[in-house]
Amino acid sequence: MFPVFHLSGESRRRMLQTALRFPHVFKARAEDSHKGTFGTLAVVGGSAGMSGAPVLAASAAMYLGCGKVRAGFNQDTLPFAVIAGFPEIMLDTADGLTKRQGINAWTAGCGLGTDAAAVETVAAVLARNRDEAVVLDADALNILSTDAETRNLARGCKNLILTPHPAEAARLLGTTVAQVQADRTAAVRKIGAILGATVVLKGHKTLVAASDTEIYVNESGNAGLATAGSGDVLGGIIGSLLAQGVPVFEAACAGAWLHGAAADVIKESAGIAAGLSAGEIAPAARWLRNWITESM
């Protein structure tokens, strides 16, 4: 049963106008497309007790149209044989997944932990083919903030996106959350300059910056996104767009916008802000992407 979503005339007009900024995201699919056309995303995370984080990211990637999704868990054995509700997602250990070929993009860090195995996993992802796009989130960012070798590998990654919340940004900069929030523009620019990455500084009016672009200020979203797992979903959305061939900066900006706009769709359709669960975001983003594509 598909959820029923709708938007008012003004919301439709506003969202269609914004979508014009993301031409690679909102385009019709060719009739002769196949799963290989839309790329393979690898999601690595999920230390013991945190298996749900990569599931949220991987399922979001499926909802946003990725051709194939693999999920790797930072555990010695798989936490489950198949993901209930998402049998399409192929499972592996994090160590096993980092050795696989045929990956177009990565989302790493969701519930990963910061133990030695986690550090090795992030390093292995960054040391692969430097043309593979990489999203680092959550614990992968915490590892970057403390491990010099991993930071050096990150600087050599051509297509790198970092998605810190203010506390993670503060750790990357060696400063405080208050200082990050006092000048978010300076913070997002500085992180990008230090690590040579596109940076998505999450929060109210998420900022996206790359070294050669102006800062994108995201206007979508509402307080419903303040829920556990929301960031994992964002990482999956951005990773999915990268795997599908969307350019790095556009994928970061469009991912942030779709993530927030999905929450706006849910609020307008069902009146839900408080109590929104992270798993409800991606189905709304899927609906929105398809509705916009058909409307343009």
From Swiss-Prot:
It catalyses: (6S)-NADHX + ADP = AMP + phosphate + NADH + H(+); (6S)-NADPHX + ADP = AMP + phosphate + NADPH + H(+). InterPro entries: CARKD (IPR000631), Ribokinase-like (IPR029056). SUPFAM superfamilies: Ribokinase-like (SSF53613). The keyword Transmembrane does not apply. Its EC number is 4.2.1.136. Its cofactor is Mg(2+). GO terms for molecular function: ADP-dependent NAD(P)H-hydrate dehydratase activity; ATP binding; NAD(P)HX epimerase activity. It is an enzyme of class 4 (lyase). Keywords: ATP-binding, Lyase, NAD, NADP, Nucleotide-binding. (6S)-NADPHX binds at A53, G113, H165, D232. GO terms for biological process: metabolite repair; nicotinamide nucleotide metabolic process. Residues 18-292 form the YjeF C-terminal domain. Belongs to the NnrD/CARKD family. Homotetramer. Catalyzes the dehydration of the S-form of NAD(P)HX at the expense of ADP, which is converted to AMP. Together with NAD(P)HX epimerase, which catalyzes the epimerization of the S- and R-forms, the enzyme allows the repair of both epimers of NAD(P)HX, a damaged form of NAD(P)H that is a result of enzymatic or heat-dependent hydration. This is ADP-dependent (S)-NAD(P)H-hydrate dehydratase. It comes from Neisseria gonorrhoeae (strain ATCC 700825 / FA 1090). The gene is nnrD.
